[in-house]
């Protein structure tokens, strides 16, 4: 069920254009009739519109003169005049030959004849040199790092090379073919109570179930500018590094407020490394093709469109944190439109949140708008904010923001071609996205790696074969970080995370949220199991059990007291699903079972004013019952007073909410009234139940044949 939030306007504008450069000095120029085959030395990225290319090249030339090669000591213009004077009788324009060695001072040694084959060859070498200079200007720091990042020199140990750069086509085809069959899985214990379940397609070899080893930072083959950010890893990073940098699809279900910054830095480091290595390969291959006379060389190093990394986040402030991490790991001298970005994405925390929990402050602190999208483009030493999607390297967006970019009103598609060549998808704070509208996330994944409807300037001779075959989804890496696992995430893992090189689910072993309650005295916690044939029939079975068993018992207590504040007064009924909430609300309003009961309502759609009134009436006893949804608690974290009984229509997804709800009983526990807690669950609630009662207890509670009621004190 969608949740209504405030919406901000779309921010899809272009980044501001930088001033034009002053151009190359005449000392490094050539005459018109010299071959101008320098296409590889222009903008390094292959999928940018011509107009955008011009803008980017102008922007990248700002303050770039210091990066040019030093000119020869002797003025090339003087040399050119001497050449022209020596060939004054020639009917053809003379050609300048730039000196390659700066320490050659004797201009009399310059040959004046420009018609020989050797001269033409040398002039072509100068053209290649200048083209290379253009590439270096736009992509400084890429080529000199080749030896450090493993490209071309140690590709056998660089996972980028194995996975994307130069994969074994035969092995890749074999894995794609076996992807629809059985996968081999291996379970392994990790650190701090974590364990992993890693899977690979069964291709008939003994390596299919082998887990990756934990590398040291030096083994990651990072770009030199990024390597200093990975001097050492702590326990969590060492645990995740082999999966993330090994290009495994990874579902990590132990994200907390304490490790979120480390996780963010880790996946930003990986995303930057992937983008920079991809650009480096494209530029180097372009230089190779520009020097080859024959068209026999085939270099496939690109996708259909430029965007390579998609990061899905819940709020604008989360986007600010990711950008801060990117710029910290890869500092750039110029950041175009940074002020516009900060003005529209960042905000200060509310001063009224001193009592709010840390997870609430992390999610909703600052600008909590969930309607945004942002393109980031990396050129040389500049980072361009608000670049057009087809000109971007990284796209950061909320699910709603990206969906509205794909669709127009009325369901008419605007286009999803910019998602056709995404090679890495990162979904952070996935548990918060579930509370927004998970349907948007599923829609985005259904639009990934499809065949584009338009060319968008694509050079199909350089498109990787698996894209042409429609197999991009089998090579794409997907990283999902969540505080806990849910059926929605499991479905995403099983259907959309199809990386043929492997995938892993990393889960914690739970002690149980019910053991960490902050209460003055212990409270009896009763769990009631009901039978449910299937997930589709679970809502009906749950409602019937609630009305016939739980509500009937509560109603007897309400009837005994005409004031409604008898034995069952002060009852908070927590309902995770809004659909179930509507059904229970209608039952309270229309059933004879509850016709004399005064009740209040707080859902995610209830206004702040109505919520305050319902809480006040419940605290004062005017309402005997308060119906309260999980999303309402997620977005507002109310401190509800006057609670003496808690009935959980279903277990909360977030185990933190369990503690919040049970601790509402704290004031009653210290008084004369004996508080009660009753929870309904079925076998389809296994993931939720495990987080509450602990990994060691959940199996027996789901399979116990002796009874369906379990009590803990």
From Swiss-Prot:
Residues 78-91 have a biased composition (Low complexity). One of its GO terms (biological process) is maturation of SSU-rRNA from tricistronic rRNA transcript (SSU-rRNA, 5.8S rRNA, LSU-rRNA). Residues 49-69, 125-149 have a biased composition (Acidic residues). One of its GO terms (molecular function) is U3 snoRNA binding. Disulfide bonds: none annotated. Gene3D superfamilies: P-loop containing nucleotide triphosphate hydrolases. One of its GO terms (cellular component) is nucleolus. InterPro entries: P-loop_NTPase, UTP25, UTP25_C, UTP25_NTPase-like. Component of the ribosomal small subunit (SSU) processome composed of at least 40 protein subunits and snoRNA U3. DEAD-box RNA helicase-like protein required for pre-18S rRNA processing, specifically at sites A0, A1, and A2. This is U3 small nucleolar RNA-associated protein 25. The gene is UTP25.
């Amino acid at each position: 069920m969608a949740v209504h939030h405030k919406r901000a306007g779309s921010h899809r504008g272009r980044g501001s254009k930088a001033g034009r450069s002053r151009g190359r000095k005449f000392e490094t120029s050539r005459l018109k009739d010299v071959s101008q085959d320098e296409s590889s030395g222009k903008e390094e990225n292959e999928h940018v519109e011509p107009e955008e290319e011009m803008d980017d090249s102008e922007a990248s030339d700002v303050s770039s003169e210091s990066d040019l090669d030093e000119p020869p000591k002797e003025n090339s213009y003087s040399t050119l005049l001497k050449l022209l004077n020596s060939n004054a009788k020639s009917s053809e324009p003379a050609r300048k030959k730039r000196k390659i060695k700066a320490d050659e001072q004797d201009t009399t040694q310059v040959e004046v004849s420009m018609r020989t084959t050797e001269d033409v060859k040398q002039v072509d070498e100068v053209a290649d040199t200048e083209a290379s200079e253009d590439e270096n200007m736009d992509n400084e720091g890429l080529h000199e790092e080749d030896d450090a990042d493993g490209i071309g020199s140690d590709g056998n140990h660089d996972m980028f090379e194995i996975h994307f750069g130069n994969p074994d086509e035969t092995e890749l085809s074999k894995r794609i073919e076996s992807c629809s069959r059985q996968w081999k899985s291996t379970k392994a214990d990790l650190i701090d109570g974590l364990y992993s379940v890693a899977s690979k397609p069964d291709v008939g070899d003994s390596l299919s179930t082998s887990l990756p080893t934990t590398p040291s930072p030096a083994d990651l083959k990072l770009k030199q500018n990024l390597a200093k950010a990975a001097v050492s890893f702590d326990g969590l990073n060492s645990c995740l590094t082999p999966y993330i940098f090994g290009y495994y699809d990874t579902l990590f279900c132990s994200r907390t407020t304490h490790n979120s910054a480390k996780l963010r830095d880790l996946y930003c480091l990986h995303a930057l490394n992937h983008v920079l290595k991809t650009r480096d390969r494209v530029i180097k291959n372009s230089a190779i093709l520009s020097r080859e006379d024959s068209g026999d060389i085939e270099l496939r190093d690109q996708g259909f469109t430029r965007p390579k990394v998609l990061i899905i986040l819940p709020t604008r402030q989360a986007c600010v944190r990711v950008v801060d991490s990117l710029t910290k790991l890869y500092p750039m001298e110029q950041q175009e439109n940074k002020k516009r970005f900060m003005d529209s994405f960042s905000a200060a925390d509310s001063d009224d949140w001193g009592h709010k929990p840390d997870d609430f402050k992390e999610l909703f602190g600052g600008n909590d708008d969930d309607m945004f999208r942002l393109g980031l483009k990396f050129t040389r030493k500049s980072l361009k904010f608000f670049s057009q999607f087809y000109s971007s390297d990284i796209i950061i967006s909320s699910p709603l923001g990206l969906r509205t970019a794909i669709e127009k009103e009325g369901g008419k598609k605007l286009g999803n071609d910019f998602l056709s060549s995404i090679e890495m998808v990162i979904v952070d704070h996935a548990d918060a996205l579930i509370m927004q509208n998970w349907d948007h996330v599923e829609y985005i994944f259904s639009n990934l790696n499809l065949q584009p409807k338009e060319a968008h300037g694509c050079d199909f001779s350089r498109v990787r074969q698996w894209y042409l075959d429609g197999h991009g989804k089998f090579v794409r890496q997907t990283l999902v970080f969540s505080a806990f696992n849910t059926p929605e995430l499991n479905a995403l893992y099983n259907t959309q995370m199809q990386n043929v090189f492997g995938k892993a689910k990393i889960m914690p072993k739970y002690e149980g949220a019910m053991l960490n309650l902050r209460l003055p005295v212990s409270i009896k916690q009763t769990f009631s199991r009901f039978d449910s044939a299937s997930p589709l029939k679970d809502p009906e079975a749950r409602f019937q059990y609630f009305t016939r068993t739980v509500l009937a018992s509560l109603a007897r207590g309400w009837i005994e007291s005409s004031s409604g504040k008898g034995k069952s007064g002060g009852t908070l009924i927590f309902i995770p699903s809004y659909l179930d909430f509507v059904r229970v609300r209608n039952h309270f309003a229309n059933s004879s079972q509850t016709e004399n009961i005064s009740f209040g309502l707080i859902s995610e759609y209830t206004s702040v004013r109505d919520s305050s009134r319902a809480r006040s009436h419940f605290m004062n006893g005017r309402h005997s019952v308060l119906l309260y949804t999980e999303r309402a608690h997620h977005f507002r974290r109310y401190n509800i007073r006057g609670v003496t009984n808690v009935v959980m229509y279903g277990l909360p997804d977030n185990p933190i909410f369990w503690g919040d709800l049970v601790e509402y009983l704290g004031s009653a526990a210290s008084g004369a009234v004996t508080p009660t807690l009753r929870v309904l669950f079925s076998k389809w609630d296994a993931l939720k139940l495990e987080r509450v009662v602990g990994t060691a207890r959940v199996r027996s509670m789901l399979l116990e044949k002796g009874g369906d009621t379990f009590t803990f004190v």
